[in-house]
Amino acid sequence: MPYEHQQIEQKWQKFWDDNQTFATSDTTDKPKYYAVDMFPYPSGQGLHVGHPEGYTATDIMSRFKRAKGFNVLHPMGWDAFGLPAEQYAMKTGHNPADFTSQNIDHFREQIKSLGLSYDWNREINTTDPSYYKWTQWIFEKLYEKGLAYESNMMVNWDPIDRVVLANEEVIDGKSERSGNKVERKALRQWVLKITAYADRLVDDLDDLDWPEAIKEQQRNWIGRSKGAAVFFNVDHADAKIEVYTTRPDTLFGATYMVLAPEHELVDSIVTAEQKQAVADYRAAIAAKSDLERTDLNKDKTGVFTGAYGINPINGEKLPIWIADYVLASYGTGAIMAVPAHDDRDFEFAKKFDLAIKPVIAGGENDDVAYTGDGVHINSDFLDGLDKATAIDQAIDWLEAHQAGHAQTNFRLRDWIFSRQRYWGEPIPVIHWEDGTTSLVPENELPLLLPHATELRPSGSGESPLANLTDWLEVTRDDGVKGRRETNTMPQWAGSSWYFLRYIDPHNDHQLADPEKLKYWMNVDLYVGGAEHAVLHLLYARFWHKFLYDLGVVPTKEPFQKLVNQGMILGANHEKMSKSKGNVVNPDDIVREYGADTLRVYEMFMGPLTQSKPWSEEGITGSRRWLDRVWRLLIDDEGQLRDHVTTVNPGDLDKIYHQTVKKVTDDLENMRFNTAISQMMVFVNDAYKSDALPVTYMNGFIQLLAPFAPHLAEELWVRLGNRESISYVSWPTYDDTKLVDDTVEIIFQVNGKVRGKATVARDINQDDMITAAKADDNVQNFITGKTVRKVIAIPGKFVNIVVS
């Protein structure tokens, strides 16, 4: 009887559903294990074969930990707000909720077909009002603590359609949808003060079991640096420019200054002669994104303001320019330029014929900036000093002369939290006509997103919610009129805390029960793509730390261990994409080969964290191996083979116990590919055996179960077991069976190998010597000669010295 994967997989998926096999209890004395996948955005395309890789990894660990006696929480949900659903709705005239619901149903069906052991009773959906009630509640707490504020921020603006565009909707400076040229425009936004947590977000990375590359990306994104704030008076003006620099020791080398075109002082310091040039330049760069402006490879542009700053350390006048490579949102929006020792400043100075003054010894080429270390030159009281000493003395001088002070800075900017979109969590704020702002009362949460069938831009830059006047306009008891906030939250909001809601998803009175949070947190294993290294992971850590400060959660960090699965590439080693025609649909694989085959193949392709190309040969090879496992135990009539027996002749002892040890060790370290390799070795040896001890077959099927759960459940029952394999205790190994009872020793005559033999491991020296002298080849070299000496090392060799 062949291995009928469709019948077997449907049977056991129904069994797991009917019996709530993977429902998790909160009341147990077992140790806990909490495994979370980065939950998916339910797109219209459905799953691709990259999704099951990470999901299978967490599922294997969850099944393994259950068998090891842990109480496992392994949930799934949907990050379901997002731009694509709104774009689809605007094209079709449908509400995005309907489209999203259909997509979720499709995703759920696909995921269930993979045999993943999720507790579906804990399923969450970020668009569910019972969920986003608590997203809104967190926002209100941030607002109450002064961590949510309003500010005018630059956005992408389509001046024809009069709509704000997300960065991904702007292609080559034009709207992807309309083709109109995009401008940059200041618009009122809600902002979260993530910078208040910058130090803790850096320092606490040291306590996490995360890939070092991810931690380094977060450190770089936060960009903590120590330096100095330096104040430059503007010549002949009542104005002062503050600059932050990590190298105050190079002040003597500053030869010009640059302000961001949007800097608040530009209008007040620009001279009449330069006013038009400055205005023209600002207009020319208005549509550029921050990314375009700071591209290191682009041609440097800028305009002189006509004004000069006074270098506080030597009194020199420095021309003040504006240039797009300086951003108003970064630092103070102003820099002091030291072109002799900074590549970008050097290129700018060369293009505009500005002075270049070396202050660090070591540069030998006038055609490039010298960015290395060296002693200071041309720097007055800093001459001859090394970098560290010079920095300290420069800061001391600035502070003594009230021209600056030591300062720690961060590259991290506050989080622009609002979106001019319909399909997002409503921000629970009301703006009153008397100029005040208030939160929606907590007992009135959730503030529901109103149903709308026609989504069209407001024309004002506000979201389509501005068109829904019945929802928008409110009146207080005292007759004061107000408007609800029309911005909605970004998709990052719901994903910043969802792992907490899994713990208590049906609680109407709290975000989650404190005792349950105390039991389950932290997340023991968090698996997802490295593309979320910064934004999602940083935002989730920020919110978690804030909730910790409120006393809502018991831990400082949400995710103790993070694993990034590698990308599954097309067969040609390129990223899978519809345009390249190399996307593999997992539904097709499950239908033709089975979910267990897909699971085994994706884990066998290579180390989990490495990118790997898809291979049709590989998937068929994995299927052939599962067929071999089936045929090892089941005959052509579908019966258990006769040589599966209660008798153990001992020939599989070593390989079985080696396999249990190897697979167990590999699972603890998530080395799934080598665990499968070891199981393949065991199957090969089992095929050579005349008798298959049922205890060893049971143990092997338990090892296989996390990888191929449907097949394992079926074979487990056919081996005579009654309960589901899911909670059966993990097999153990016997250390004494891991080594051979015999050992190979070599026989030497005068130090040259003349023979070898397999002997008992505990053989004594006398018996070793007897065996050596009895060896036919050894006898050829010692017969007729005098034995001078015999050296015998137990378990190693015998050396007979003759003459």
From Swiss-Prot:
GO MF annotations in UniProt: aminoacyl-tRNA deacylase activity; ATP binding; leucine-tRNA ligase activity
Name the major location: cytoplasm
Supply the enzyme class, top level: ligase
What cellular component terms from Gene Ontology apply here? cytosol
The record's section on Pfam families has: Anticodon_1, tRNA-synt_1, tRNA-synt_1_2, tRNA-synt_1g
- SUPFAM superfamilies for the chain: Anticodon-binding domain of a subclass of class I aminoacyl-tRNA synthetases (SSF47323), Nucleotidylyl transferase (SSF52374), ValRS/IleRS/LeuRS editing domain (SSF50677)
Q: Where is this motif: 'HIGH' region?
A: 40-51
Q: Which PROSITE patterns match?
A: AA_TRNA_LIGASE_I (PS00178)
Q: Does the keyword ATP-binding apply?
A: yes
Keyword annotations for this protein, in alphabetical order, are:
Aminoacyl-tRNA synthetase, ATP-binding, Cytoplasm, Ligase, Nucleotide-binding, Protein biosynthesis
Q: CDD domains given for it?
A: Anticodon_Ia_Leu_BEm (cd07958), LeuRS_core (cd00812)
| UniProt record similarity statement | Belongs to the class-I aminoacyl-tRNA synthetase family.
- Protein name (Swiss-Prot/TrEMBL): Leucine--tRNA ligase
Q: To which species is this protein native?
A: Leuconostoc citreum (strain KM20)
